[in-house]
Amino acid sequence: MTTDGRKLLCSALSLLLMNAACSASKSDGAAGGSSSSAAGTVGAPMGGDESGGTTNATEAGQGGNGGSQTGIGGTGPGAVGGTSSQAGSAGANTPTGDNCTVGAWPAADPTAVGPYATVTENEVGPQAGEAEGAGGAGGAGGAGPGIVPKFTLFRPKELSPGGLCHPVITWGNGTGSTPSVYRSLLTLFASHGFVVIASNSKNVARGTPRPMVVGIDWVLQQNADPSSVLYHHLDTTHIGATGHSQGAVATSQAAGDSRITTNVPIEGAQVQKNLHGPAMLFCGGMDEVVGCTGAQSALTAVTTLPAMYAEYSSVDHGSWMSFNGKPSVVYGAVNAWMRVHLMADVALRPWFYGSSCKLCSDTGWKIQQKNMDQ
């Protein structure tokens, strides 16, 4: 074979090898991209059952077992996926979107069920923390060893009525309790327009805020996910935290999260580090389980932010939850606080602010204020 023939043959072989390599590379890239996409897909919550108001949401694609959340919420810096150390990172923050705008909500009576029909979605979102008996620091409790609880979502059936984005409330249960124990309060919130994410943990990670924070992460991811029913319906700039007993301890600790606008620990408040928003520190005057010392200490520790110590004299550690066909006095006060600070309900502001505030002049309450002159 001549020299020119050899050169021509080598060129042809090189071209064939390059094409084969490129095809393999493209195939690998497509497979990798498909895997990444599948891992990042979170099934959108399903609509509620109108007759009972509840539904079990399908979470196709929500990876993770034993507390690992790899693959939840997609890829990129906004994902929760990975290890528990990443639990505090939020999904894409979209305060306004195609479906709603942030603004003041219409006035409503906080002591009555709100104007919106509600839906409850069970077992949604990622697993949050370790199960009771699963080992590790601060197990989340739940249905038994190795079982890691998820969340219950309480929301208005119709989203963004009047084009308004829904503020978010994250909830923490008391010891041994699930969201069903607090259903009347959490449904009250939803009937007023709040989207409430409540950990199903019976121990709320034994008083640590992880489940409450992971709940925020998840709803923010849903707000950024076009396949989610919550897509661009949430006001991600107004997020409240509240919880009872051990959940109040978790609320106090979660208050340092920069995304939380206001917090209301109920019968279990502790001194709050890195507080950056108004706080209502509630206790029952007849509470012999945790008493009111923690709430008083939490108020003393506040320096510049608005804070209220609110003791309702006639209730104990559980009787504040009485419903009897209408919300309890405490429900109404907590709901009013959330409406003022998350919905810009200025009509309810005099309930709390000023020396002659509504609660201040109510003999059923013992009120102490800090930085709440106006």
Where are these regions (language model features)?
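A conserved short beta-strand
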Residues: 259-269
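Active-site-adjacent alpha-helix of alpha/beta-hydrolase-fold enzymes
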Residues: 275-344
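Short amphipathic alpha-helix adjacent to the substrate-entry channel of hydrolases
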Residues: 180-199
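Short glycine-enriched nucleophile-adjacent loop
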Residues: 248-258
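Short beta-strand element of the alpha/beta-hydrolase
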Residues: 163-174
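Ser/Thr-rich, Pro/Gly/Ala-heavy low-complexity intrinsically disordered linkers and tails
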Residues: 19-98, 130-142
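Gly/Ser-rich "nucleophile elbow"/oxyanion-hole loop immediately N-terminal to the catalytic nucleophile
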Residues: 160-165, 207-249, 347
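N-terminal cap/lid segment of alpha/beta-hydrolase-fold proteins
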Residues: 95-164
